[in-house]
Curated annotation (Swiss-Prot):
Pfam families: Ribosomal_S5, Ribosomal_S5_C. It comes from Rhodopseudomonas palustris (strain BisB5). With S4 and S12 plays an important role in translational accuracy. Located at the back of the 30S subunit body where it stabilizes the conformation of the head with respect to the body. Gene3D superfamilies: 3.30.160.20, 3.30.230.10. Signal peptide: none annotated. Belongs to the universal ribosomal protein uS5 family. GO terms for cellular component: small ribosomal subunit. GO terms for molecular function: rRNA binding; structural constituent of ribosome. Residues 23-86 form the S5 DRBM domain. Keywords: Ribonucleoprotein, Ribosomal protein, RNA-binding, rRNA-binding. The keyword RNA-binding applies. The N-terminal domain interacts with the head of the 30S subunit; the C-terminal domain interacts with the body and contacts protein S4. The interaction surface between S4 and S5 is involved in control of translational fidelity. Part of the 30S ribosomal subunit. Contacts proteins S4 and S8. This is Small ribosomal subunit protein uS5.
Length: 191
């Protein structure tokens, strides 16, 4: 018991390294920015990073600094603070089709059968790869700004519900919900 609560850096830093190693990070976008000051322009860099554990947790972060590696580090730290959990069907795709939006950017995400792969444009592909989705079809409409596309994708994923969550919200059994889904032409009864 006392060994578990020991103070000191080695064990704690090793645990932190293990926790950090479980995440996969993708650099989505790097941008050179300028701040106009009295003596001229002061240049810096802004980075957009997406991280995930490829098991249903994903987050994105934005970081700014004078040097690229520092901006990426800040963005990665921000992404770790911004992690969200997404319920996946069979651990490989979405439960249902969904749309998301942010600003002028709209994204449409569709569940896909096994073997389809990730059919999505740049920033959305990074989100799906770090999330652990293997089969999805995605379309972006409107703004192609990477920030808007990533935020719109997260907006869509935020509204994704598993059958278990829907059944709990409606106070019905999951099997009842699944039978309605499989039936297709079966009449849906409002509750």
């Amino acid at each position: 018991m006392a060994a578990e609560r020991e103070r000191g850096g080695r064990e704690r830093s090793r645990d932190r390294e293990e926790r950090d190693s479980e995440f996969v990070d993708k650099l989505v976008h790097i941008n050179r920015v300028a701040k106009v000051v009295k003596g001229g322009k002061r240049f810096g860099f802004a980075a957009l990073v997406v991280i995930g554990d490829q098991k249903g947790r994903v987050g994105f972060g934005h970081g700014k600094a004078r040097e690229v590696p520092e901006a990426i580090r800040k963005a990665t730290e921000a992404a770790k603070r911004n992690l969200t959990r997404v319920a996946l069907r069979e651990g490989r795709t979405l439960h249902h089709d969904i749309a998301g939006r942010h600003g002028a950017g709209r994204v449409y995400l569709r569940a896909a059968p096994a073997g389809t792969g990730i059919i999505a444009g740049g920033p959305m592909r990074a989100v799906f790869e770090t999330l652990g989705i293997q089969d999805v079809v995605a379309k972006s409409i409107g703004s192609s700004n990477p920030y808007n596309m990533v935020r719109a994708t997260f907006d869509a994923l935020k509204h994704l519900d598993s059958p278990r969550a829907v059944a709990a919200r409606r106070n019905i059994k999951v099997s009842t919900l699944q039978s309605r889904r499989v039936g297709g032409d079966a009449e849906v009864v409002a509750e």
